[in-house]
């Protein structure tokens, strides 16, 4: 326990909470340009080729973002919208690309959970 004198000298500092998506700078989403689109393999025990993109954000950060859904049209120089949200089995991937906005088209023939993949209601 600190003495009264110690508390007068320097006050108690509040515990600062560290953000899990620092590149967004407190914003819900950020726009960016793809610099590289490639696939990586997940951690054990999973096995797949997960599609990711290296994105240069308007905030100046260069991040790795996951491309959700089946099939995508993202390539180098594509302008994409990035949101927070990590991918548990891909170390270092802490962002998702928002499908159905800017240059990232929605997932083709998606019937359920459409809002998460940028798909309009079928007629």
Curated annotation (Swiss-Prot):
Keywords for this protein: Chloroplast, Plastid, Ribonucleoprotein, Ribosomal protein, RNA-binding, rRNA-binding
UniProt xrefs under InterPro entries: NA-bd_OB-fold (IPR012340), Ribosomal_uS12 (IPR006032), Ribosomal_uS12_bac (IPR005679)
Subcellular location: Plastid, Chloroplast
A GO molecular function held by the record: structural constituent of ribosome
PROSITE patterns: RIBOSOMAL_S12
Function: With S4 and S5 plays an important role in translational accuracy. Located at the interface of the 30S and 50S subunits.
Stated family: Belongs to the universal ribosomal protein uS12 family.
The protein's name: Small ribosomal subunit protein uS12cz/uS12cy
Species of the source: Populus alba
Gene that produces this protein: rps12-A
């Amino acid at each position: 326990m600190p003495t009264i004198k110690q508390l007068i000298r320097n006050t108690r500092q509040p515990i600062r909470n560290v953000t899990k998506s620092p590149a967004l700078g407190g914003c819900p989403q950020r726009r960016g340009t793809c610099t590289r689109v490639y696939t990586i393999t997940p951690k054990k025990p999973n096995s797949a080729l997960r599609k990711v993109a290296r994105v240069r954000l308007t905030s100046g950060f260069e991040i790795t973002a996951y491309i959700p859904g089946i099939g995508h049209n993202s390539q180098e120089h594509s302008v994409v919208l990035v949101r927070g949200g990590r991918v548990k089995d891909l170390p270092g991937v802490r962002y998702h690309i928002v499908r159905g906005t800017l240059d990232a088209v929605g997932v083709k023939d998606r019937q359920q959970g459409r809002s998460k993949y940028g798909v309009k209601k079928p007629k």
